């Protein structure tokens, strides 16, 4: 996973609250399990409106999304974060996030930065006054900077550590590769009776008679001639 320490990019003001995961990416697009190819599906219904913020040329290269409170509510689909990341967003700023969505962001290289709503309102105003305005998000100092305005944000220490080091779940697991190998060796020695995968035994196929076509039966009894 790509490390995230400091990013300077165009900020995108999304003046909407209670944005749920179905609005982020509709369920009809959840037929794939890969993490890429979802950029066109992000905010699909809203992007059909020519006045939607992402359709404005000044914001098309935006990588920092500034949204209203309770972002990412609804179903727990991880595709919502995949779509944001695939579009290019590395940071989402809001005053509140849904818990599961917040957890999914850290696993996929997206920072969910928490700021007071008053700070969000100020950022919205500045971004709308000058569309395409650049802003800097610094994980090291936990600050957002726009021109001479510096605003602090909150981020979980563990999430911050993961993002700054670029650790996804697989990276974290591989840090214990030696321990896992040692455990498997111990288990094989201590429990030698554990089931093992054996090659398939090939046997000759048996001939199966059809129940609809029974074998001819010879009757040798006293009524055989009738």
From Swiss-Prot:
One of its GO terms (cellular component) is 3-isopropylmalate dehydratase complex. Pfam families: Aconitase_C. It catalyses: (2R,3S)-3-isopropylmalate = (2S)-2-isopropylmalate. Its EC number is 4.2.1.33. GO terms for molecular function: 3-isopropylmalate dehydratase activity. Pathway: Amino-acid biosynthesis; L-leucine biosynthesis; L-leucine from 3-methyl-2-oxobutanoate: step 2/4. It is an enzyme of class 4 (lyase). Keywords: Amino-acid biosynthesis, Branched-chain amino acid biosynthesis, Leucine biosynthesis, Lyase. Catalyzes the isomerization between 2-isopropylmalate and 3-isopropylmalate, via the formation of 2-isopropylmaleate. Belongs to the LeuD family. LeuD type 1 subfamily. Heterodimer of LeuC and LeuD. This is 3-isopropylmalate dehydratase small subunit. It comes from Bifidobacterium animalis subsp. lactis (strain AD011).
């Amino acid at each position: 996973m790509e490390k995230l320490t400091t990013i300077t990019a165009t900020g995108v003001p999304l003046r909407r609250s209670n944005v749920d995961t179905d609005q982020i990416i509709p369920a009809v697009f959840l037929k794939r399990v890969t993490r890429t190819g979802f950029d066109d599906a992000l905010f699909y219904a809203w992007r059909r409106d020519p006045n939607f913020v992402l359709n404005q040329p000044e914001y098309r290269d935006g990588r920092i999304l500034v949204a209203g409170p309770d972002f990412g509510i609804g179903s727990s689909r991880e595709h919502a974060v995949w779509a944001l990341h695939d579009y290019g967003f590395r940071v989402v700023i809001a005053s509140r996030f849904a818990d599961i969505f917040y957890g999914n962001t850290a696993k996929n290289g997206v920072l969910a930065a928490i700021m007071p709503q008053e700070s969000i309102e100020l950022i919205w105003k500045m971004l709308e006054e000058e569309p395409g305005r650049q802003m800097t998000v610094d994980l090291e100092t936990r600050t957002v900077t726009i021109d001479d305005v510096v605003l602090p944000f909150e981020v979980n220490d563990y999430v911050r550590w993961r993002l700054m080091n670029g650790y996804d779940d697989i990276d974290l697991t591989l840090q214990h590769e030696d321990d896992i190998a040692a455990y498997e060796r111990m288990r094989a020695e201590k429990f030698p009776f554990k089931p093992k995968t054996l090659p398939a035994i090939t046997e000759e196929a048996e001939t199966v008679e059809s129940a609809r076509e029974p074998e001819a039966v010879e009757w040798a009894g006293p009524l055989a001639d009738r």
